[in-house]
């Protein structure tokens, strides 16, 4: 059974996604800039609605559009948002942080990981910026820290499938799940079959 996790912008799309039969959704604000954290009010209502319909809710945790590195103030915001999400009963958090050298920002990530306690953790598509030769070390560290999933668009390579296949080999070896991101509904089944994966993610993975 193929599990699709649509990335929705705020609350209004949530009922339609639930109606379409999804079992897991991700929510963010400002998708035009890559997605930022939704407000506390939206988060609370989304948790209530999702759980009433036996749907699992992930939220994107990002203080602004654009890529990391994040500064200290932005990291404090992310930490506070993670604690808030945890208290409101959100099921999972999607976040990431890299250094200017496109390495995992371990120092920034540690307090975020602590704040996400009790939720599943998915490393964001920032993973795509990590150089291929550094990905193995990154995946090992993320697994050690308790991450569950890694999102990747596969766009670091001209051949998405080759990129996903390489990353999946790494994630499989340490018990992490690679979730292909940026997948459109019309190609979902084919990609899932080719990769041997059961979960896909994206703004267009569900035709709403």
Label every PLM stretch briefly.
Residues 2-8, 25-27, 55-61, 93-95, ...:
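Hydrophobic faces of well-ordered beta-strands that scaffold small-molecule active sites
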Residues 2-20, 26-30, 34-35:
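N-terminal beta1-alpha1 ligand-phosphate binding loop
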Residues 10, 63-65, 99, 125-127, ...:
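Short, flexible active-site-adjacent loop segments at beta-strand->alpha-helix junctions, enriched
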């Amino acid at each position: 059974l193929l599990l699709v996790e649509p990335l929705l912008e705020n609350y209004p799309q949530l009922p339609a996604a639930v109606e379409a039969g999804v079992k897991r959704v991700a929510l963010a604000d400002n998708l035009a800039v890559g997605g930022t954290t939704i407000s506390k009010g939206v988060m609370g209502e989304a948790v209530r609605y999702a759980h009433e319909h036996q749907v699992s809710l992930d939220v994107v945790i990002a203080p602004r559009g654009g890529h990391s590195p994040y500064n200290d103030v932005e990291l404090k915001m992310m930490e506070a948002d993670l604690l808030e999400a945890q208290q409101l009963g959100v099921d999972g958090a999607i976040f990431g942080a890299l250094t200017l050298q496109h390495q995992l920002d371990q120092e920034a990530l540690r307090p975020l990981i602590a704040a996400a306690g009790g939720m599943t953790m998915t490393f964001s598509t920032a993973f795509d910026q990590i150089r291929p030769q550094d990905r193995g070390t990154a995946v090992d560290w993320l697994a050690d820290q308790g991450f569950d999933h890694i999102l990747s668009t596969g766009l670091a390579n001209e051949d998405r499938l080759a990129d996903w296949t390489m990353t999946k080999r790494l994630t499989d070896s340490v018990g992490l799940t690679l979730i292909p991101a940026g997948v459109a509904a019309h190609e979902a089944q084919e990609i899932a079959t080719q990769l041997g994966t059961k979960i896909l993610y994206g703004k267009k993975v569900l035709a709403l």
